[in-house]
Amino acid sequence: EEVLAGNIKELVLVNCCDTIRSVYDILKDSGQMDFLYMIDMLHCDIECSRERTAAQLKELAETYGAYKEKSFDKKVFLEAFQPKERIQKPHLAVLGARMGQELFQMTEAAMPLPVVNETCVYNRSVGENLPTEEMDFDTLMEWYAGELLHQIPCMRMMDHAGRKVLYQDPSLKGIIYHTVKFCDFYSFEYADIKGHTDVPLLKIESDFTLQSSGQLSTRLEAFAESLGIQDETKKEKVMGKGYYAGIDSGSTSTDVVILDKNREIISSVIMPTGAGAANGAERALEEALKQAKLNREDLDAVVTTGYGRTAISDGDKSITEITCHARGAHFLDPRVRTVVDIG
């Protein structure tokens, strides 16, 4: 789309699947490109693969140099390599197929720890042995070919055992595993990781758009809650009399339940939400307190959930319906392992 809109005139494609080959053919036939080149992605790190990749890199440099009427600049090439700093403190990682920037930002915003993007194309980096100025052009391309093929392998490589380093990090506290519709490579890895890691694991799927952003956001928030990492910006705790209120703020109705310290329901109210989730929640809570013959000061905590939970600033904690449903089902019957639907 960017090319056909005239925003890109020079493009190097990596031949990793049928889709890229089709894109290459379409762009070539369009006649809109000033420079178009496709380089093969080889699937193994052996001597003949390195030789083939080095030959392609040399041809690319020569072809592009002829197009730009410039020669290869070794100084600029060497300056392009910057050491990658890997995070050492507790963090979460996004693994799997490439994730769009908007979805990754949504993931970062929902999580209580730093999030590292380790999906396809984002975990690319060469080794620690960087090239030197003494290397000539041919030697540099041979070095570069070896480094490209010796990176953390993607799932298209014949030997992808090296990917285990992505989820065997001792500072890793959770994994969000992303797959793209109709890209089957990474679903196999998810099944393998699921059986070989003890850290919390969430699988999400997208079509590289934000079409299902609402559902994805709710699942990400529920996963964040399941990690059990407390928010350091909690409100000051005020002790009441052992009563707790739960507010479920829906688009149509607002439900309030008050429990005592023995987890017994002492009052419950269902009222129309009306104009504004916060106002509806306040009215319903006041009615529930009235039925229970309690004052607001008697409550130890107020927890909000549902469609309008983020609009209710009066609550002590806000959690997703997914978490509420899961914990509620487990409380009613601890044998439950799968929830099909509640609500």
Cite the ranges covered by each PLM segment.
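Short beta-strand-loop/turn "lid" adjacent to the catalytic site in phosphate-handling enzymes
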Residues: 270-273, 292-323
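Short glycine-aspartate micro-motif
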Residues: 244-248, 300-303, 337-340
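Short active-site oxyanion
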Residues: 8-12, 91-92, 299-300, 314-316, ...
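An N-terminal assembly and electron-transfer interface module characteristic of large anaerobic redox
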Residues: 1-244, 262-264, 274
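A short acidic Gly-Thr/Ser loop motif
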Residues: 97, 247-252, 307, 342-343
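Conserved phosphate-binding catalytic cores of ATP/NTP-utilizing and phosphoryl-transfer enzymes
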Residues: 235-239, 307-343
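Short glycine-rich, Thr/Ser-proximal phosphate-binding strand/loop in the N-terminal lobe
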Residues: 247-279, 287
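Short acidic, glycine/serine/threonine-rich loops at helix termini
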Residues: 106, 257-259, 281, 311-316
